[in-house]
Regions:
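Catalytic core of the metallo-beta-lactamase
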Residues: 1-29
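Conserved phosphate-coordination/catalytic loops
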Residues: 40-44, 135
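Surface-exposed cleft-lining segments at the edges of enzyme active sites
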Residues: 31-40
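Glycine-rich beta-alpha junction loops
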Residues: 1, 67-68, 111
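C-terminal regulatory/interaction regions
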Residues: 92-152
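Divalent-metal (often Zn2+) His-rich catalytic cores of metallo-beta-lactamase-fold enzymes
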Residues: 45-100
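Amphipathic, non-membrane alpha-helical segments in soluble helical-bundle scaffolds
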Residues: 19, 43, 73-76, 80, ...
Length: 152
């Protein structure tokens, strides 16, 4: 997620206190949202961290936002897929000349549709937005894309 974040495994229970690397998920929901605020999102490192979590096979995940989840592989798979999908989505719109506000509006439409498809209601989409709003998430992804392009 970011170079300064850590995760802690409790060996007796197998619980991984994963922080933001495990995404945003509200209790009672299956939907996992990647928290991508600026300034230090690193998608490549994040995916490596997700794969590292898979290798240590925790029994449960405790993301910063919120709760405890036992469906570790499903959770991580959805997070990784959505992270890569959102990165491509934002990058394509940047290439088309869209600015951060336009991209954030489009990402909100996309993200809300994804949540509703997984059974959330409009009130729950608002709760997810409180945990990580699209304007902030979009700016984080855009900064990552710009930084990656400068070093390519």
């Amino acid at each position: 997620h970011a170079y300064h974040h850590l995760a802690y495994l409790e060996p007796d229970s197998g619980a991984l206190f994963a922080g933001d690397v495990a995404g945003i998920r509200l209790p009672g929901q299956s939907y996992v949202r990647p928290p991508t605020p600026p300034p230090e999102i690193d998608v490549d490192a994040w995916i490596k961290s997700i794969n590292h979590i898979r290798r240590i096979t925790p029994a449960s995940l405790y993301p910063t936002h919120f709760g405890c989840y036992d469906d570790v592989e499903r959770h991580l798979g959805e997070l990784e897929q959505r992270l890569q999908d959102w990165l491509l989505f934002v990058e394509e719109r940047m290439d088309g000349g869209a600015g951060s506000e336009e991209i954030a509006d489009e990402l909100k439409d996309k993200g809300d549709a994804e949540m509703l498809a997984e059974g959330a209601d409009t009130e729950e989409t608002r709760h997810y937005d409180l945990a990580g709003n699209y304007e902030m998430l979009t700016i984080g992804i855009m900064r990552y894309v710009e930084r990656r392009r400068k070093t390519a």
